[in-house]
Structures are given as C-alpha cells and as structure tokens.
Amino acid sequence: MRLRNIPDALERIQNQNLLVKTPWNIDDSWIIEIGMGKGKMISQLAFDNPNKNFLGVEKYPSAAVKAIKYVKKYNLSNFFILISDAKDLLDRIKGKASTIWLTFPDPWPKNRHYKRRLTYKDFLEIYANLLVKDGILKLKTDNLKFFEFSIESLKENGWKITYQTNDLHNSLVNSSNIKTTYEEKWVNLNYKIHYLEAIFI
C-alpha cells in the first residue's frame, strides 16, 4: 500500500522532542529498530523496558510520525526517532547498542536488486560496527526467500545464528514477541513469520 505523504511530518516529530540530532551518542542501554514503520513494536518494547533506551530508525517521516500516538499512549521518555537510510547509520550514530532489530525489511525480490537487501554484506558490516560484543541482531520477515538469503549472507560474513524458526508464532520465543502493524496483517491471513537471532563473531 502506498504511503500517504504528510507534508508536516518531520515538524510534528520535532515538536514532540522525539527527533535525535546527529551524530547521536548511544551505549549498551540502547536498542535500535531499523525500518520501524509506524513504531508499534518498538514503542511497546520501550514501555515494557523503562530502563532501556530505544531508537527507531525510519527513512520516511510520513511513516515515523505515526509513532507519536504510541508515545502519548504509553507516556514514553525512552524512545526517540532517527530519520535516516540504513546505509548512513555509521555517520548518524556514535557508540554501540545491545540489540538491533530488522523488522519486515523490503525483500527486494529481483536478483539485480540483491545489494539493496538489508542483510546484504555491506549492511551487515554496519550492524557489526553498531553492536557491542555479543550484541544481538534480530530479524523478522514474512518472505521465505529473503529469509534464506539472510541466513546465507550472515553465515558468509562472520555471523553466528543462535536461533532461527520458520514459524515465529508457534515457537519458543513467541511469548515475548510483540507484533508490528505489518505482522498483524499477515498473521491474520495465516502467513508464517520467519525469525532469527545472530551475533557477530
């Protein structure tokens, strides 16, 4: 579905004091979601973990502005937004996080676009530099081919997969899973969600 443009989206995010100034300094208390969309999952994580800090990275202000309603709903003070393309994160963030989430990234299914996939080696190198030692990269996707590509890419580029499942909602980790807006849509259509956790070694 096409994202409706909201002309004043960036201004509205700024007015809520959610927009970070770059370079933004972080430490191991931070958890990052890349491609947070409307922010449903990360805002719930922020509410459930008040002693952690959360940074939602989103390329499109018109999507990110939707997170404001969750900030108000949960009265969050530990959640912030960075408007950025993933390829620019090492210039925008200084320090290392404990966890990075990739939630339903564009699978770029055409072979000629494989370098755009967020689990291509160039992006994995960025994540490795943004995570503390033994920091965790977590991936959720509904696209099996993208999931299989991601597994191979991780293995080929110095990562160890510590957990994986092709059916997240019938897995051991489902009890702690928080659904994204996109995830809820596909689960209602009986799609299986693929999930993995990995560390850089």
From Swiss-Prot:
Family: Belongs to the class I-like SAM-binding methyltransferase superfamily. TrmB family.
Known role: Catalyzes the formation of N(7)-methylguanine at position 46 (m7G46) in tRNA.
Keyword Signal among UniProt keywords: no
Cited NCBIfam families: PRK00121.2-2 (NF001080), tRNA (guanosine(46)-N7)-methyltransferase TrmB (TIGR00091)
Major enzyme class: transferase
Residues forming the catalytic site: D106
Lineage of producing organism: Bacteria, Bacillati, Mycoplasmatota, Mycoplasmoidales, Metamycoplasmataceae
Cross-referenced Gene3D superfamilies: Vaccinia Virus protein VP39 (3.40.50.150)
GO cellular component: tRNA methyltransferase complex
Keyword S-adenosyl-L-methionine: yes
Recorded metabolic or biological pathway in which this protein acts: tRNA modification; N(7)-methylguanine-tRNA biosynthesis
UniProt organism field: Mesomycoplasma hyopneumoniae (strain J / ATCC 25934 / NCTC 10110) (Mycoplasma hyopneumoniae)
Molecular function per GO: tRNA (guanine(46)-N7)-methyltransferase activity
UniProt binding sites for substrate: K110, D142, T180, T181, Y182, E183
Protein name from the UniProt record: tRNA (guanine-N(7)-)-methyltransferase
Catalytic activity: guanosine(46) in tRNA + S-adenosyl-L-methionine = N(7)-methylguanosine(46) in tRNA + S-adenosyl-L-homocysteine
